[in-house]
Protein backbone atom coordinates (compact mmCIF):
# COMPACT_ATOMS: atom_id res chain seq x y z
CA UNK A 1 0.00 0.00 0.00
CA UNK A 2 2.82 2.38 0.86
CA UNK A 3 4.61 1.51 -2.35
CA UNK A 4 1.48 2.30 -4.34
CA UNK A 5 1.15 5.67 -2.65
CA UNK A 6 4.83 6.49 -3.34
CA UNK A 7 4.40 5.44 -6.96
CA UNK A 8 1.28 7.52 -7.23
CA UNK A 9 3.04 10.56 -5.60
CA UNK A 10 5.88 10.29 -8.12
CA UNK A 11 9.48 11.24 -7.64
CA UNK A 12 10.63 14.43 -5.95
CA UNK A 13 10.64 17.52 -8.16
CA UNK A 14 14.07 18.15 -9.62
CA UNK A 15 15.34 14.63 -8.88
CA UNK A 16 17.02 12.67 -11.73
CA UNK A 17 14.29 10.00 -11.59
CA UNK A 18 11.59 12.56 -12.48
CA UNK A 19 13.43 13.54 -15.70
CA UNK A 20 14.10 9.92 -16.54
CA UNK A 21 10.46 9.07 -17.10
CA UNK A 22 10.02 11.93 -19.58
CA UNK A 23 10.24 11.36 -23.31
CA UNK A 24 12.60 13.16 -25.63
CA UNK A 25 9.90 15.51 -26.82
CA UNK A 26 8.90 16.37 -23.26
CA UNK A 27 12.50 17.03 -22.30
CA UNK A 28 12.91 19.30 -25.35
CA UNK A 29 9.77 21.18 -24.39
CA UNK A 30 11.02 21.43 -20.76
CA UNK A 31 14.32 22.95 -21.91
CA UNK A 32 12.43 25.57 -23.84
CA UNK A 33 10.21 26.40 -20.87
CA UNK A 34 12.53 28.46 -18.64
CA UNK A 35 9.96 29.43 -15.96
CA UNK A 36 9.19 25.79 -15.40
CA UNK A 37 12.90 24.92 -15.13
CA UNK A 38 13.37 27.73 -12.67
CA UNK A 39 10.46 26.49 -10.58
CA UNK A 40 11.84 22.96 -10.60
CA UNK A 41 15.26 24.16 -9.43
CA UNK A 42 13.77 26.24 -6.68
CA UNK A 43 11.76 23.32 -5.38
CA UNK A 44 14.79 21.00 -5.16
CA UNK A 45 16.18 20.13 -1.70
CA UNK A 46 19.78 21.06 -2.59
CA UNK A 47 18.77 24.53 -3.69
CA UNK A 48 16.68 25.01 -0.57
CA UNK A 49 19.64 23.94 1.63
CA UNK A 50 21.92 26.40 -0.16
CA UNK A 51 19.31 29.10 0.26
CA UNK A 52 19.15 28.45 4.00
CA UNK A 53 22.96 28.60 4.24
CA UNK A 54 22.94 31.87 2.32
CA UNK A 55 20.37 33.39 4.66
CA UNK A 56 22.39 32.28 7.70
CA UNK A 57 25.59 33.81 6.26
CA UNK A 58 23.79 37.05 5.50
CA UNK A 59 22.43 37.23 9.04
CA UNK A 60 25.88 36.54 10.50
CA UNK A 61 27.49 39.17 8.28
CA UNK A 62 24.84 41.68 9.26
CA UNK A 63 25.50 41.07 12.97
CA UNK A 64 29.26 41.38 12.49
CA UNK A 65 28.79 44.57 10.49
CA UNK A 66 26.70 46.11 13.26
CA UNK A 67 29.32 45.10 15.85
CA UNK A 68 32.13 46.56 13.75
CA UNK A 69 30.23 49.78 13.25
CA UNK A 70 29.70 50.00 17.01
CA UNK A 71 33.48 49.61 17.54
CA UNK A 72 34.40 52.19 14.90
CA UNK A 73 34.63 55.19 17.30
CA UNK A 74 36.89 53.17 19.57
CA UNK A 75 39.04 52.24 16.58
CA UNK A 76 39.34 55.85 15.50
CA UNK A 77 40.29 56.93 19.02
CA UNK A 78 42.90 54.16 19.25
CA UNK A 79 44.32 55.13 15.87
CA UNK A 80 44.61 58.76 16.96
CA UNK A 81 46.26 57.75 20.25
CA UNK A 82 48.69 55.52 18.36
CA UNK A 83 49.66 58.39 16.06
CA UNK A 84 50.25 60.61 19.11
CA UNK A 85 52.39 57.92 20.73
CA UNK A 86 54.44 57.54 17.56
CA UNK A 87 55.03 61.29 17.51
CA UNK A 88 56.09 61.26 21.17
CA UNK A 89 58.35 58.28 20.51
CA UNK A 90 60.00 60.14 17.63
CA UNK A 91 60.59 63.19 19.83
CA UNK A 92 61.98 61.04 22.65
CA UNK A 93 64.33 59.28 20.22
CA UNK A 94 65.59 62.62 18.90
CA UNK A 95 66.12 63.93 22.44
CA UNK A 96 67.89 60.73 23.42
CA UNK A 97 70.23 60.95 20.41
CA UNK A 98 70.97 64.60 21.22
CA UNK A 99 71.70 63.80 24.86
CA UNK A 100 73.92 60.86 23.90
CA UNK A 101 75.92 63.12 21.61
CA UNK A 102 76.31 65.74 24.34
CA UNK A 103 77.24 63.01 26.83
CA UNK A 104 79.98 61.72 24.54
CA UNK A 105 81.35 65.24 24.16
CA UNK A 106 81.21 65.78 27.92
CA UNK A 107 82.91 62.44 28.61
CA UNK A 108 85.64 63.29 26.14
CA UNK A 109 85.99 66.76 27.63
CA UNK A 110 85.94 65.67 31.27
CA UNK A 111 87.92 62.45 30.92
CA UNK A 112 90.72 61.89 33.48
CA UNK A 113 93.41 62.59 30.86
CA UNK A 114 91.77 65.87 29.82
CA UNK A 115 91.28 66.85 33.46
CA UNK A 116 94.95 66.13 34.14
CA UNK A 117 95.99 68.30 31.20
CA UNK A 118 93.70 71.08 32.41
CA UNK A 119 95.17 70.92 35.92
CA UNK A 120 98.72 71.02 34.57
CA UNK A 121 97.86 74.02 32.39
CA UNK A 122 96.32 75.80 35.40
CA UNK A 123 99.43 75.02 37.43
CA UNK A 124 101.73 76.45 34.77
CA UNK A 125 99.57 79.55 34.50
CA UNK A 126 99.67 80.06 38.28
CA UNK A 127 103.46 79.66 38.29
CA UNK A 128 103.87 82.17 35.47
CA UNK A 129 101.57 84.63 37.24
CA UNK A 130 103.63 84.30 40.43
CA UNK A 131 106.82 84.99 38.49
CA UNK A 132 105.27 88.08 36.89
CA UNK A 133 104.19 89.35 40.31
CA UNK A 134 107.68 88.81 41.69
CA UNK A 135 109.23 90.72 38.79
CA UNK A 136 106.78 93.57 39.28
CA UNK A 137 107.63 93.71 42.98
CA UNK A 138 111.37 93.70 42.30
CA UNK A 139 111.02 96.42 39.67
CA UNK A 140 108.93 98.54 41.99
CA UNK A 141 105.86 98.43 39.76
CA UNK A 142 103.74 96.95 42.56
CA UNK A 143 103.61 97.79 46.23
CA UNK A 144 104.18 95.23 48.95
CA UNK A 145 100.66 95.68 50.36
CA UNK A 146 99.13 94.78 46.99
CA UNK A 147 101.68 92.04 46.28
CA UNK A 148 101.21 89.92 49.40
CA UNK A 149 97.46 89.09 49.06
CA UNK A 150 97.70 88.43 45.32
CA UNK A 151 100.84 86.31 45.70
CA UNK A 152 99.27 84.34 48.55
CA UNK A 153 96.17 83.58 46.51
CA UNK A 154 98.27 82.55 43.52
CA UNK A 155 100.47 80.23 45.56
CA UNK A 156 97.45 78.67 47.27
CA UNK A 157 95.86 78.05 43.87
CA UNK A 158 99.10 76.58 42.51
CA UNK A 159 99.42 74.28 45.53
CA UNK A 160 95.82 73.15 45.13
CA UNK A 161 96.26 72.42 41.42
CA UNK A 162 99.51 70.54 42.05
CA UNK A 163 97.88 68.38 44.72
CA UNK A 164 94.92 67.62 42.49
CA UNK A 165 97.20 66.72 39.58
CA UNK A 166 99.26 64.38 41.75
CA UNK A 167 96.16 62.65 43.12
CA UNK A 168 94.74 62.26 39.63
CA UNK A 169 98.01 60.80 38.34
CA UNK A 170 97.96 58.31 41.20
CA UNK A 171 94.39 57.31 40.33
CA UNK A 172 95.36 56.83 36.67
CA UNK A 173 98.35 54.69 37.63
CA UNK A 174 96.15 52.51 39.83
CA UNK A 175 93.68 52.11 37.00
CA UNK A 176 96.46 51.11 34.60
CA UNK A 177 97.81 48.58 37.09
CA UNK A 178 94.37 47.10 37.64
CA UNK A 179 93.80 46.92 33.87
CA UNK A 180 96.97 44.89 33.33
CA UNK A 181 96.38 41.13 32.80
CA UNK A 182 96.96 38.85 35.74
CA UNK A 183 100.12 36.63 35.66
CA UNK A 184 99.82 33.12 34.30
CA UNK A 185 99.37 30.09 36.52
CA UNK A 186 102.95 28.89 36.08
CA UNK A 187 104.39 32.31 36.90
CA UNK A 188 102.12 32.62 39.94
CA UNK A 189 103.16 29.15 41.17
CA UNK A 190 106.85 30.01 40.72
CA UNK A 191 106.41 33.26 42.62
CA UNK A 192 104.59 31.43 45.44
CA UNK A 193 107.34 28.78 45.63
CA UNK A 194 110.01 31.48 45.77
CA UNK A 195 108.12 33.28 48.52
CA UNK A 196 107.70 30.06 50.55
CA UNK A 197 111.37 29.00 50.16
CA UNK A 198 113.19 29.74 53.49
CA UNK A 199 116.19 32.09 53.25
CA UNK A 200 119.60 30.44 53.20
CA UNK A 201 121.84 31.19 56.22
CA UNK A 202 124.99 33.25 55.78
CA UNK A 203 128.36 31.50 56.29
CA UNK A 204 129.80 31.69 59.78
CA UNK A 205 132.19 34.57 60.31
CA UNK A 206 135.73 34.05 61.57
CA UNK A 207 136.26 34.39 65.29
CA UNK A 208 138.06 37.58 66.16
CA UNK A 209 141.14 37.31 68.40
CA UNK A 210 140.56 37.87 72.08
CA UNK A 211 142.41 40.19 74.37
CA UNK A 212 144.77 37.40 75.49
CA UNK A 213 145.95 36.86 71.90
CA UNK A 214 146.57 40.56 71.43
CA UNK A 215 148.98 40.74 74.36
CA UNK A 216 148.87 42.33 77.81
CA UNK A 217 147.76 45.97 78.01
CA UNK A 218 150.40 48.56 78.82
CA UNK A 219 151.06 49.14 82.49
CA UNK A 220 149.37 52.18 83.97
CA UNK A 221 151.32 53.99 86.71
CA UNK A 222 149.60 53.71 90.03
CA UNK A 223 150.73 57.11 91.36
CA UNK A 224 150.48 60.27 89.26
CA UNK A 225 153.01 63.09 89.64
CA UNK A 226 151.82 66.33 91.24
CA UNK A 227 150.24 68.95 89.05
CA UNK A 228 153.00 71.47 89.73
CA UNK A 229 155.70 69.10 88.55
CA UNK A 230 154.15 68.62 85.06
CA UNK A 231 155.33 71.16 82.48
CA UNK A 232 152.57 73.33 81.01
CA UNK A 233 153.08 74.17 77.34
CA UNK A 234 152.53 77.78 76.36
CA UNK A 235 149.12 78.54 74.83
CA UNK A 236 149.21 80.32 71.52
CA UNK A 237 146.00 82.14 70.91
CA UNK A 238 144.75 84.19 68.04
CA UNK A 239 143.74 87.84 68.36
CA UNK A 240 140.06 86.95 68.01
CA UNK A 241 140.09 83.83 70.21
CA UNK A 242 141.70 83.78 73.65
CA UNK A 243 142.28 80.01 73.47
CA UNK A 244 144.73 78.23 71.28
CA UNK A 245 143.88 75.69 68.61
CA UNK A 246 142.70 72.37 69.98
CA UNK A 247 144.76 69.37 68.84
CA UNK A 248 142.96 67.01 66.48
CA UNK A 249 142.67 63.40 67.56
CA UNK A 250 143.88 60.93 64.99
CA UNK A 251 141.62 57.91 64.45
CA UNK A 252 142.74 54.65 66.00
CA UNK A 253 143.70 52.13 63.31
CA UNK A 254 141.28 49.27 63.32
CA UNK A 255 142.28 45.72 62.64
CA UNK A 256 140.86 44.32 59.39
CA UNK A 257 138.36 41.54 59.76
CA UNK A 258 139.11 38.28 57.99
CA UNK A 259 136.93 37.56 54.96
CA UNK A 260 133.84 35.40 55.28
CA UNK A 261 134.25 31.79 54.31
Swiss-Prot record:
Presence of keyword Transport: yes
Domain of life: Eukaryota
Region (Disordered): 172-261
Record's subcellular location: Late endosome membrane
Segments crossing the lipid bilayer: none
Biased composition (Low complexity): 181-195
Function: Component of the ESCRT-I complex, a regulator of vesicular trafficking process. Required for the sorting of endocytic ubiquitinated cargos into multivesicular bodies. May be involved in cell growth and differentiation.
Name of the protein in its database record: Vacuolar protein sorting-associated protein 37D
Organism: Mus musculus (Mouse)
